[in-house]
Amino acid sequence: QMLSALAEELGGVIEESECVLVSMLAGVTLERLEALFPGKRILRIMPNTPCAVGSGMLFLCRGSLAAEQDAEAFRQLMACAGRIDEIPEKWMDAASAVAGCGPAFAYMFVQALADGGVECGLPRAKATEYAAQMLLGSAQMVLQTGAHPEKLKDDVCSPGGSTIAGVHALENAAFRAACMDAVTAAYERTKGLG
C-alpha cells in the first residue's frame, strides 16, 4: 500500500526523468516495480550492512528495460561497497537471506565466541577482537583459496585435538541446523514482504 502511494506521489517526477530507478525494497519484485513505474529502467538491489565499511555483499538484478550500461554504471558507483554480484531475480530473496541477514548471525557468532573467551579468562575487548579477526580471516580463506569450507574445517582439526572437541560440541548443539533454520526463516519472511 505504501509503495503504491509513493509511486503515485513520485510518478510525475520520475516520468519526466531519464533516471534509472534503483530499488532496495525487500521482497518487491521487478515485475511489481515495472507495473508501478512503466517505461522506466529499473535495477533491484540488496546490499548488506558491511557495505558501510567497504566489505559488503551487494546483489543486483536488472529490469526488462535496464541495459548493461545501467548495471555497469551502478557497479562503478558502488564498487567501494565491496563485492557486487548480478544475479537472476529468482535468487534475490535467498541471496538476501544468506548475505543480507547473515551479518546479524555473524555478529551473534562473534559475541558467542567472545562470551566463551571471557568465561575462559580473556578480557571482553580482547575476546571480541580475536573472534572478529578470526571470522574475517576465515572468510578470506574461503574466498581466496576456493576450498570447500568442510576441507578448511578439517585442516584445522587435528586428531584428538581441542578443535575437534569444539566441533563435536557444536554438532551436539545442532549448530549447522540452527544456521540453516535461520537462513530459511529469513528467506520465508522476505518472500512475504512483497
What label would you give each PLM region?
Residues Q1-L60:
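Rossmann-like NAD(P)(H) cofactor-binding subdomain of soluble oxidoreductases
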Residues M2, T29-R32, F105, L113, ...:
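Hydrophobic alpha-helical segments typical of transmembrane helices
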Residues R32-R41, M57-A95, Y107-Q144, R189:
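Internal alpha-helical scaffold of NAD(P)-dependent oxidoreductase catalytic cores
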Residues I42, M92-A97, P149-D154:
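Short pre-catalytic strand/loop immediately N-terminal to key active-site residues, enriched for Gly-Thr
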Residues M46-C51, S96-A106:
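Glycine/serine-rich anion-binding loops at beta->alpha junctions
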Residues A132-G194:
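NAD(P)-dependent Rossmann-like dehydrogenase/reductase catalytic/cofactor-binding core
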